Amino acid sequence: ECHHVSSVSFEQVLRQVTATFVYGLTATPIRTDGHQPIIFMQCGKIRFTSDAKSQMENQGFKRLLIPRFTSFRSITSDRKTYVQITQELSEDKVRNEFVMEDVKAAIQKGRTPLVLTTRTAHVKVLAQMLMPFADHVIQLIGADSAKEKRLALQNLQSIPISESLVIVATGKYVGEGFDYPRLDTLFLTMPIAWKGNVEQYAGRLHREYEGKSEVCIYDYVDIRVPLCDSMYRKRLKGYIKAGYGKNVTSPAPDKNSQELIYERNNYEAAFRNDLAKAKHSVVIAVPKVKFKYKPSIMSALANLLHDGVPVVVHVKEEGANELELSNAGMDVVCNKEQTLQCAIIDKSIVWYGNINFFGYNSETNNVMRIADYKIANEMMEILYSATENKVNEKSYTLPI
């Protein structure tokens, strides 16, 4: 865990070390506080990186990401802090039951889940709810004493494989130094944004273990809460880096298609393919329509309009190229309160992330393809309810 070198106490120790060579190992060389130059100063530059692709080639199990979109919404329109939001999420009974149904199903399938949250009180609530459904429910929280932590780990090692087990813990407890190879399913019940945390938590599942054929991450996305929606879009990058970008399965029972996480350099062909198959409608939501040259999808959308398929574009910030879209025959609606970024095709396929289909995208932008009509309709409801409730919305129409 050499990323700790940038802390004052560790740096002071290393300044006194007279070793000829200093070796550092870490899963997260980039720190959220930006102090990684101190790591490189004390340990030298990165000499070797083992990426997810090479690791997966040497392992016998698949990595699956299962996004779970919740129905949670705040009862007030006030802007809340992250702490206030997580408290509301942890106390929401419907949301907790939604998570529990997934965990119970995993236990019944013989899986060994790790349920992660950011709040100690939430650990206790979830553990209590799980007591009737597993032989062993282990709680691990950062506030435990060293003795309690040692006893908990000893207890884990003594549990036979024939007995069901679920671990409920805070992210800080299992973030580093926690090793229990039996784990194969992660439930990320609270929003996080930093990709380093995603990789760190996912790493808890990547230990070799006899009989392990796949590892799954259930990620709970509260798309009706703008901060949670934004944080999910940010952590998609972490999933790609951890090897979860190529094998994503839909939680919908009636869908067998495979979804993928795409980046800016590889999404267009697949997206245009979905557009070409559209029969009924296309709805696109972007923060801004701004381009110097016409985006490549304009021709695909023009073909749809020619065939009588309506195309609606929702825009958060107006004042750029909206009129060009209107002149092409698209309906353009501007709403400053819009938060979603997505494309919804035939109310059944969703492209959701932070890719702007009508603007510039950086190398960190990405998008997830989800074939699920329930999620599609949920996003339609969010988009159109926001539009209908906004008094100062503006629609662009062709001049007569």
Question: Where are each of the predicted segments found?
Answer:
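Post-DEXD/H (motif II) to motif III coupling segment of the RecA-like Helicase ATP-binding lobe
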Residues: 3-64, 239
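Conserved interdomain hinge at the start of the Helicase C-terminal
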Residues: 77-118, 124-129
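Conserved SF2 helicase motif VI
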Residues: 26-29, 193-217, 235-236
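A short beta-strand element within the Helicase C-terminal
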Residues: 167-168, 176-191, 200, 216-219, ...
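Conserved helicase ATPase core of P-loop NTP-dependent helicases/translocases
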Residues: 114, 124-125, 134-175
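PLD/PLD-like phosphodiesterase catalytic module centered on the HKD motif
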Residues: 253-400
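Conserved Walker B
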Residues: 1-5, 172-174, 190-191, 205
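C-terminal helicase lobe
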Residues: 74-77, 84, 209-254
